[in-house]
Swiss-Prot record:
GO molecular function: heme binding; iron ion binding; methyltransferase activity; oxidoreductase activity; sterol 14-demethylase activity
Protein name: Obtusifoliol 14-alpha demethylase
Catalyses which reaction(s): a 14alpha-methyl steroid + 3 reduced [NADPH--hemoprotein reductase] + 3 O2 = a Delta(14) steroid + formate + 3 oxidized [NADPH--hemoprotein reductase] + 4 H2O + 4 H(+)
Biological function: Catalyzes the 14-alpha demethylation of obtusifoliol to 4 alpha-methyl-5 alpha-ergosta-8,14,24(28)-trien-3 beta-ol.
SUPFAM superfamilies (alphabetical): Cytochrome P450
First-tier enzyme category under EC: oxidoreductase
Keyword annotations from UniProtKB, A to Z: Heme, Iron, Lipid biosynthesis, Lipid metabolism, Membrane, Metal-binding, Methyltransferase, Monooxygenase, Oxidoreductase, Steroid biosynthesis, Steroid metabolism, Sterol biosynthesis, Sterol metabolism, Transferase
Family the entry assigns: Belongs to the cytochrome P450 family.
EC number: 1.14.14.154
Compartmental location: Membrane
Source organism of the structure: Triticum aestivum
A GO term from the CC aspect: membrane
PROSITE patterns xref list: CYTOCHROME_P450 (PS00086)
GO terms, biological process: methylation; sterol biosynthetic process
Length: 453
């Protein structure tokens, strides 16, 4: 009972369609073949599992049955040697423990203070009124915030321009061709490798300086410096650099993209903007102007607005695993398929998040679908909403991301009126992390919320 295979030239047919865009391919074949189908790409076979009925094994399997390492090894030149997908599962789990420690609630509390301070400083430079590209502004604010919370005070205060330029070269060195040929000697890859070497030198200097002076900071860099493996070994400078790069890559684009989509939808649908503003007034009645971790956690309306933007536009449109054992799946219609070991297995948040049997009017922006009484993502069971992945490999940075986006939009809702003046944006399907095409131009006007006590 093998999955149906898409028709076409057996070697390059699937590759050509895949490179033209995975979402049109998935949309066409889901309609024709159903939620389980195989796409031959060169010598590999990618089997798609679309929807919670068939994707549970993808999310819940042990690493020995379904692994990330082989399919994400293209990240190794970017992250560097000795971290994440360049190490075996046991070491990778220990490194993920370092991430978990760096994202604990007590750490998040200190990060929120830094997020709020960065937002206040950034938007203080805006005038009384004006027109800005919201996408550009939020991209810049989020890299500033990430520099402060993740990379540390030294980078934020003294080396920001240098480090930003180097990360830009790393970023531009991750192209669709990089997934298949990560070491291809092209100019973008050469610039990527040079940037990675220079970043290692910069962070080695900072780490040595911190250790020599005995100073300790409230940032992710410090968490990684202080981390130890179970055998007592300290992290090396190279490992710390690689883990920081991985953290920034995981969070920077995804947060700036989602912040921008959240704003675009709030400005398009004024009833939700009004609800979000009203929520801010209620919060301010209780807490005044103060913003901290616990106060942000009270903002359910804003949370649902962000979550719905992320449902419609997950920046990671495909998740991949390498299958090391045979397994079977059963569709909700009762059809069974056997997937052999050796296949790459894929699912797509961008497509699965819009399945009409899970989400009512799936292409509509409706944050209330997550409100008490509806909770469409829970009614359909686990793995219905997969913008942050799920199961054994759910996104460790989910709480950080929500706090960061909430901190930004809390400040904006309290201090500005907006009007979207460019056409509503579209997805930029050409990017590895799917962002927003073109500018998102908005008029802003400064104002203060008046709260009736």
């Amino acid at each position: 009972r093998p999955p149906p295979t898409i028709p076409g030239a057996p070697v390059v047919g699937g590759l050509l369609r895949f490179l033209r865009g995975p979402i049109p391919l998935i949309r066409a074949e889901y309609a024709r073949l159903g939620p389980v189908f195989t796409v031959p790409i060169l010598t590999r076979r990618i089997t798609f599992l679309i929807g919670p009925d068939v994707s549970a094994h993808f999310f819940k399997s042990n690493e020995s049955d379904m692994s990330q390492q082989e399919v994400y090894r293209f990240n190794v030149p970017t992250f560097g040697p000795g971290v994440v997908f360049d190490v075996d599962y046991q070491v990778r789990q220990e490194q993920f423990r370092f991430f978990t420690e760096a994202l604990r609630a007590n750490k998040l509390r200190s990060y929120v203070d830094q997020m709020v301070a960065e937002a206040e400083e950034y938007f203080s430079k805006w005038g009384e009124s004006g027109t800005v590209d919201l996408k550009y502004e939020l991209e810049h604010l989020i890299i500033l915030t990430a520099s402060r919370c993740l990379l540390g005070r030294e980078v934020r205060e003294k080396l920001f321009d240098d480090v930003s330029a180097l990360f830009h070269d790393l970023d531009n060195g991750m192209l669709p061709i990089s997934v298949i040929f990560p070491y291809l000697p092209i100019p973008a890859h050469r610039r990527r490798d040079q940037a990675r070497t220079r970043l290692a030198e910069i962070f080695a200097t900072i780490i040595k300086s911190r250790k020599a002076s005995g100073q300790s900071e409230e940032d992710m860099l410090q968490c990684f410096i202080d981390s130890k493996y179970k055998n007592g070994r300290q992290t090396t400078e190279s490992e710390v650099t690689g883990l920081l790069i991985a953290a920034l890559f995981a969070g920077q684009h995804t947060s700036s993209i989602t912040s921008t989509w959240t704003g675009a939808y709030l400005l398009k649908f004024q009833q939700y903007f009004a609800e979000a503003v009203e929520e801010q007034k209620e919060v301010m009645k209780r807490h005044g102007d103060k913003i901290d971790h616990d106060i942000l956690a009270e903002m359910d309306v804003l949370y649902r607005c962000i979550k719905e933007a992320l449902r419609l536009h997950p920046p990671l449109i495909m998740l991949l695993r390498q299958s090391h054992s045979d397994f079977s799946v059963t569709t909700r219609e009762g059809k069974e398929f056997d997937i052999p070991k050796g296949h790459i297995v894929a699912t797509s948040p961008a497509f699965a998040n819009r399945l009409p049997h899970i989400f009512k009017n799936p292409d509509s922006y409706d944050p209330d679908r997550f409100a008490a009484g509806r909770e469409e993502d829970k009614v359909a069971g686990a793995f219905s909403y997969i913008s942050f992945g799920g199961g054994r490999h759910g996104c460790l940075g989910e709480p950080f991301a929500y706090l960061q986006i909430k901190a930004i939009w809390t400040h904006l809702l309290r201090n500005f009126e907006f009007e979207l003046v460019s056409p509503f944006p579209e997805n930029d399907w050409n990017a590895m992390v799917v962002g927003i095409k073109g500018e998102v131009m908005v008029n802003y006007k400064r104002r203060k919320l008046i709260v009736d006590n």
